[in-house]
């Protein structure tokens, strides 16, 4: 699996070959540093750990400082592991090597975007699951417009089944959006523009895979 770590900058609009407007997300990706290389002999599988976004040394715990010193790099805020990275890239990866955006992606191909969705706090079933509420707004209905309705049967089975959609904490979850096209790639500025929206707020971390 090939990928890179980046940040969401915002959204814009581009036009495709047919002249249709396409809502797009602007992402800054990399450069990332190889902070660890895993192999079958020692770890049981092959993978590459990439680090992104510099962090102050005084805010880094000593075990992690040793981890970064082995790679001869500055502390990083975000660490992500990609399996079979070197094999798919087609060349040997070295510890401390810098991975650029144009090393992984080309304009026109499709990628997957992973991010942390915006947290909404405790929400009801209408906002959380798209419920329509109970009944109409006449005929004596009272405070039922956004109610969940029945959540189970009576004496049989005498319980509420797992997975019942109810009110609760909404958002703040890892979300993956697949098959987003790279509309534009600006390698000198480490920026790419992909079609559609990606999860998370501005300046949130985004993992791009292909």
From Swiss-Prot:
GO biological process, one term: translation
GO cellular component terms given for this protein: cytosolic large ribosomal subunit
Top-level lineage group: Bacteria
UniProt similarity note: Belongs to the universal ribosomal protein uL3 family.
UniProt cross-references to InterPro entries, sorted A to Z: Ribosomal_uL3, Ribosomal_uL3_bac/org-type, Ribosomal_uL3_CS, Transl_B-barrel_sf
Keyword ATP-binding recorded: no
Molecular functions (GO terms): rRNA binding; structural constituent of ribosome
Keywords: Ribonucleoprotein, Ribosomal protein, RNA-binding, rRNA-binding
Self-association state and partner proteins as the record states: Part of the 50S ribosomal subunit. Forms a cluster with proteins L14 and L19.
Taxonomic lineage: Bacteria, Pseudomonadati, Bacteroidota, Cytophagia, Cytophagales
Protein's UniProt keywords contain Ribonucleoprotein: yes
Function: One of the primary rRNA binding proteins, it binds directly near the 3'-end of the 23S rRNA, where it nucleates assembly of the 50S subunit.
Pfam families hit by this protein: Ribosomal_L3
SUPFAM superfamilies reported for this sequence: Translation proteins (SSF50447)
Name assigned to this protein: Large ribosomal subunit protein uL3
């Amino acid at each position: 699996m090939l990928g890179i770590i980046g940040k969401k900058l915002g959204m814009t609009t581009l036009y495709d070959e047919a002249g249709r407007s396409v809502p797009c997300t602007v992402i800054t990706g990399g450069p990332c540093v190889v902070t660890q290389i895993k192999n079958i002999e020692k770890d049981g599988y092959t993978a590459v750990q990439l680090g992104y976004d510099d962090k102050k040394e005084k805010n880094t715990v000593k075990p992690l400082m040793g981890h970064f010193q082995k790679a001869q790099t500055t502390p990083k805020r975000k660490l992500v592991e990609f399996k079979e990275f070197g094999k798919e890239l087609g060349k040997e990866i070295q510890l401390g090597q810098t991975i650029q955006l144009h090393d992984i992606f080309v304009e026109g191909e499709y990628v997957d975007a992973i991010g942390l969705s915006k947290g909404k706090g405790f929400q009801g079933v209408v906002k959380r699951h798209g419920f329509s509420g109970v009944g109409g707004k006449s005929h004596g209905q009272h405070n039922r417009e956004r109610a969940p309705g029945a959540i189970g049967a009576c004496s049989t089975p005498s319980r509420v089944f797992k997975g019942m959609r109810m009110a609760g904490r909404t958002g703040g979850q890892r979300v993956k959006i697949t098959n987003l096209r790279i509309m534009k790639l600006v390698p000198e500025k480490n920026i790419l523009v992909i079609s559609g929206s990606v999860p998370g707020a501005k300046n949130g971390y985004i993992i791009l895979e292909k």
